[in-house]
Each structure stands twice: as structure tokens, then as C-alpha cells.
């Protein structure tokens, strides 16, 4: 108690010193609080998907480097040949800006191309309507899934939004699903999203550009079966890679590398945050 009274007397006699001390404490406490919020959000908070520990990130790896992307034909082959996963989905490596027509003026929104059942793979069902099915994976498909924000802002949260039309890049699409509020695709920290992804369009796997194996532009995500291990799934994918290399010589230096989804998303920032917290 005596020390506290002495400290108050010192600060009363030296207001400038007191201001510096208070400012330093305020900055230190604020920085610590902010850093804890970042660490809690990145490292401690579970991924916003059902049973995220079963989710696996798959990316193409060559002898000399990792490409982090897979070609559409390879995705189709892996999806049809593997039995280690409940489901296997894919999405474009980055979203793209599209123009959506409105009554007032055209609006620019972010859209991502995704495969059938990607939302189901993540364990997040649309709040209304359905996920994409394989029949949607064609150039002629006009199905679209919209975000909760688009449903609210552009359709007023209408109960009958499923089946309504929306014009995207001068093409008329039919809304087949609405994602829950707060849903995000698992882009890793190498993709800096300046705007949320509000539209989800189906991959057109029969498009001529999607038939070229040397064009790698997909990210693959799988949900392991309950009885499967990551090691066994990796071994099975290695076997499929060798089978494909025997048919497609350009694939002879290529294979899939599997890592837990959480490790891929937060792995590269974990050491930096740990150092900052320690300091």
C-alpha cells in the first residue's frame, strides 16, 4: 500500500512522466489484446466446417516444386478412382470479379467456380435449396448458388428465392441454393480476398479449356472416410498418380500431396504469430 501511495505522489509531481507511463501501458495492453485476438481467431478457433479434422487439402507437387493447383482432368480422374474419401471437391484457385445486373446499375461481385458437392464436402449445407450436383458441371449449366448477403441485399430475403433469375456477365442464371450467413470458402492465407465471395458458379468440366491437363487451376479438398487415415489416402493417391503417368507421359513428374486443411490454412502463419506472442 505504501508503494502505491508513493507511486501516486511521484506521478503527481511529474505529470509528463505519468503521461509517458500511462501511454506505454495503454499501448502495451492494446497490442497484447489485439495479438491475442489474432491468435485466437487464426490458431485457436476451429475451422467453420463440420468435423474439420477430416478435411484434407490436396495440391499438385512436382519433383522441383509444389504448384498448389490441379488440372480439371486430373481432378475428374482422382474423384472417380479414389475410395478413401466420402467426397472430393474442387474450386478455382482464386475467385473472379463478375458483373451482376440490377435495376439501378451493374454491380461488381466476386464469384468462384466450384465443383459439384464442394459445399457438402465441407459439411456446410445451403440454408435454402441445394448444393451443385454433377449434372451442373457442364458449359450449358445455368445454376448458381448465392451468398446470404446477396439473398438479403438483392432479393430482400424472399422465401421464394430458389428458382429466381440473376444475370451474371450477361448470362441468365437460376438460383438453386443460398449459403448460410458467414460462409466462406477455405482459401489459404496466400489468397488475399478484398471482397467476400458472393456467387458460386459450377465448374464446366466439359469445356475445351477444362480438358487440358497442363492447365492447373483447381484446389482440391476431400473429406476422409471415418475409417481412413491420411497416410492411407496419400498412398492411394500415389498409386493413382502412377496410373495416370503411364497413360499421360506429361504427368510422370507429378503427384498429389495431402495435408490437413487446417495445417494448410494456418500453418504458414503459426510460427510468426507464436514469435510475436512470445515477444
Walk through the language-model features, giving the residues of each.
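Generic recognition of well-ordered alpha-helical segments
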Residues: 2, 6, 13, 41, ...
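Loop/turn elements at helix/coil->beta-strand transitions in domains of secreted/extracellular proteins
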Residues: 53-55, 84-87, 173
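N-terminal membrane-entry
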Residues: 265-279
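Mid-to-C-terminal secondary-structure elements
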Residues: 96-97, 110-133, 142-269
Amino acid at each position: 500500500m505504501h508503494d502505491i501511495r508513493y507511486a501516486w505522489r511521484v506521478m503527481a509531481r511529474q505529470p509528463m512522466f505519468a503521461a509517458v507511463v500511462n501511454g506505454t501501458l495503454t499501448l502495451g495492453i492494446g497490442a497484447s489484446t489485439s495479438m491475442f485476438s489474432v491468435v485466437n481467431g487464426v490458431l485457436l478457433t476451429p475451422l467453420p466446417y463440420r468435423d474439420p479434422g477430416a478435411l484434407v487439402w490436396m495440391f499438385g507437387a512436382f519433383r522441383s516444386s509444389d504448384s498448389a493447383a490441379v488440372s480439371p482432368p486430373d481432378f475428374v480422374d482422382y474423384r472417380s478412382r479414389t475410395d478413401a474419401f466420402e467426397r472430393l471437391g474442387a474450386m478455382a484457385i482464386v475467385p473472379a470479379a463478375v458483373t451482376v445486373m440490377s435495376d439501378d446499375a451493374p454491380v461488381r461481385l466476386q464469384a468462384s467456380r466450384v465443383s459439384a458437392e464442394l459445399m457438402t464436402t465441407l459439411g456446410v449445407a445451403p440454408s435454402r435449396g441445394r448444393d451443385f450436383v454433377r449434372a451442373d458441371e457442364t458449359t450449358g449449366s445455368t445454376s448458381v448458388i448465392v451468398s446470404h448477403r446477396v439473398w438479403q441485399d438483392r432479393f430482400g430475403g424472399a422465401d421464394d428465392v430458389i428458382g429466381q433469375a440473376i444475370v451474371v456477365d450477361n448470362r441468365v442464371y437460376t438460383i438453386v441454393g443460398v449459403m448460410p450467413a458467414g460462409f466462406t470458402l477455405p482459401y489459404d492465407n496466400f489468397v488475399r480476398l478484398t471482397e467476400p465471395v458472393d456467387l458460386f458458379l459450377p465448374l464446366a468440366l466439359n469445356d475445351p479449356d477444362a480438358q487440358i491437363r497442363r492447365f492447373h487451376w483447381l484446389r482440391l479438398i476431400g473429406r476422409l472416410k471415418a475409417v481412413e487415415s491420411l497416410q492411407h489416402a496419400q498412398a492411394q493417391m500415389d498409386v493413382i498418380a502412377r496410373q495416370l503417368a503411364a497413360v499421360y507421359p506429361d504427368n510422370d513428374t507429378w503427384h498429389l500431396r495431402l495435408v490437413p486443411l487446417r495445417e494448410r490454412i494456418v500453418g504458414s502463419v503459426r510460427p510468426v504469430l507464436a514469435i510475436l506472442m512470445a515477444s
